[in-house]
Amino acid sequence: MKLSNRVLEMEESVTLAAGARAKALKAEGRDILSLTLGEPDFTTPKNIQDAAIASIQDGRASFYTVTSGLPELKAAINAYFERFYGYSVAPNQVTVAAGAKYSLYTFFMAVVNPGDEVIIPTPYWVSYGDQVKMAEGVPVFVPAKEDNHFKVTVEQLEAARTDKTKVLVLNSPSNPTGMIYTREELLAIGNWAVEKDILILADDIYGRLVYNGHEFTPISSLSEAIRKQTVVINGVSKTYAMTGWRIGYAVGEAEIIAAMSKIAGQTTSNPSAVAQYAAVEALSGEQDTVESMRQAFEERLNTIYPLLAEVPGFEVVKPQGAFYLFPNVKKAMEMKGYTDVTEFTTAILEEAEVALVTGAGFGAPENVRLSYATDLDTLKEAVKRLKAFMEK
């Protein structure tokens, strides 16, 4: 059977592949410590679980919902935006999806025509480029330098812009680097996008997970002109420990949101009703558990960062948000005789029994990604093994 060129040209998600490999080795009895997947190790808070159970027991979750999401969930998203973004959104400016990843997909399918260019700063989350290609667009990768905390400048963006540029992808806090753009940096980028009539895709999924006094500023909150140029992608997965529930959403101008909902109507229809009722409680219920989880991530970061910096050949920029470390391992590879980062991470997996994610899938062939969304004992032991591997 001949598969489509579309799928043959598609890359496998390196994060999912690394996680699957680690699980397979664990199933064989290997003592694998996996630092691969980007999901909190906490269970979903009880008040959210209870809201989901109630929606099943009283029958509300038994039926289809509107494709773009429950009115109650849209109202909760509006209240959330009023609190954390400083502005209101109308129901027709919101569409809910089966995960933020699917919101991203419908956005690209809704706005990108064949040949349109999408600027993506590198390092980048692994699915951006392939989703652009699925929409027949052209990803244009702009390197964000480590000495600038993995952040691009307006000058770099302007140098990459052509008359085919349609979208700028902006992910802050970033997966995989954990960097956060300042208000001043975002204002400069936002004004540039407005002046050049370039859409901003703001992936804000890690916006509540910031540490050590750093602040998250939503680019869409900076001015009405920037807001109209921006589509915000967010969800409940990372902030509320709900990765398995698969609820994301997009907020933006009504025309784009309607187009995204139209695509969902011909593909997934509505997201799970049970998960939507759970998301209502997540966004509108008590938020104390969010802060306790954030504090736990902050403690892990502050504990593990100096330990990782002591691993020979690992050069680490301390992240400001999300829950990843993204060390440069060029020197480490040279010390161990490797020139390919994927081969290097494979050797670490086989010999040290620590599962990392190759930086190649993030557009960073000299880096690896470690998730610190796991307990401190596991993190300490993993770094201990990495150090022993490098010193052997």
What is the role of each PLM region?
Residues 280, 295-304, 316-332, 366:
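Conserved glycine-rich beta-strand-loop-beta hairpin in the small C-terminal domain of fold type I
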